[in-house]
From Swiss-Prot:
Top-rank taxon, per record: Bacteria
Subcellular location: Cytoplasm
Similarity field: Belongs to the RimP family.
Keywords from the UniProt entry: Cytoplasm, Ribosome biogenesis
GO biological process: ribosomal small subunit assembly; translation
Organism per entry: Brucella abortus (strain 2308)
Pfam families: DUF150_C, RimP_N
Designated name of the protein: Ribosome maturation factor RimP
Predominant localisation class: cytoplasm
Location of region: Disordered: 195-219
Record-linked NCBIfam families: PRK00092.2-5
Bilayer-crossing regions: none
Underlying gene: rimP
Keyword Signal found: no
Length: 219
């Protein structure tokens, strides 16, 4: 692994005003409760925690900076910091692989601000209960408001309203759909950050770091 970036040692803790509206359940929630304060202290935001049966057991922790970036060095820093905390708390039985990654381009949408930041792009949204006659929605994010998001369908669907307002408290899962427009806009934003047009730091990584990952095995 590369050396820890010195700037990260003095990161400002992330404010919790923009809390996640989509949260984990079960063991994932237990792990999230352990690692989120640690990640915030480093200056990052937790996106998602998921324990899967991939390669035995894999604990995936998605994180990002407040500006949405996440480099390989960032992943390594988070990995080195949360690993000993998880060793002490020991929330998972048996061996597992710890994987720290960025949200990627087709990212999960877990905060109200995510919907506003990616307005104009296509997303898939699921609700915890039936809403407007269904629980699954797909469409362009028209606008993210204080308590809801409006989705305009990008596909012909007979019997369903083309424009639907979905309250945030009903959303159980949401993520962007990978499109050419999304890839172009994500890379444009990444380039702008590197050139200093948008405030940001530690921007020396290549665009591929949008999907960067750091993995280690835990016993």
């Amino acid at each position: 692994m590369t050396e820890q970036v010195q700037a990260n040692e003095t990161e400002t803790p992330v404010a919790v005003a923009d809390e996640r509206i989509i949260r984990e359940t079960g063991i994932d929630a237990k792990v999230a409760g352990i690692v989120e304060p640690v990640i915030n202290t480093l200056g990052f935001r937790l996106v998602r925690v998921r324990l899967s049966g991939l390669n035995g057991q894999t604990l995936q922790i998605m994180a990002e900076r407040p500006d949405g970036t996440m480099t390989v060095d960032d992943c390594e820093l988070v990995s080195r910091t949360v690993a000993p905390v998880l060793d002490v708390e020991d929330p998972i039985s048996g061996k597992y692989h710890l994987e720290i990654s960025s949200p990627g381009i087709d990212r999960p949408l877990v905060r109200k601000s995510d919907f506003s930041d990616w307005a104009g792009h296509i997303a898939k949204v699921e609700t915890s209960i039936v809403h407007e006659g269904r629980k699954k929605f797909r469409g362009r994010i028209v606008v993210g408001e204080a308590d809801s998001v409006t989705i305009e369908s990008d596909q012909i669907s007979y019997g369903n309203e083309p424009v639907v307002r979905i309250p945030f408290d009903l959303i159980s899962d949401a993520r962007l759909v990978l499109t050419d427009d999304l890839i172009r806009d994500a890379l444009r934003k990444d380039k702008a950050l590197r050139e200093g047009r948008i405030p940001g730091d530690d921007l020396g990584a290549e665009p591929e770091d949008v999907a960067s990952t750091e993995t280690q095995e835990k016993k």
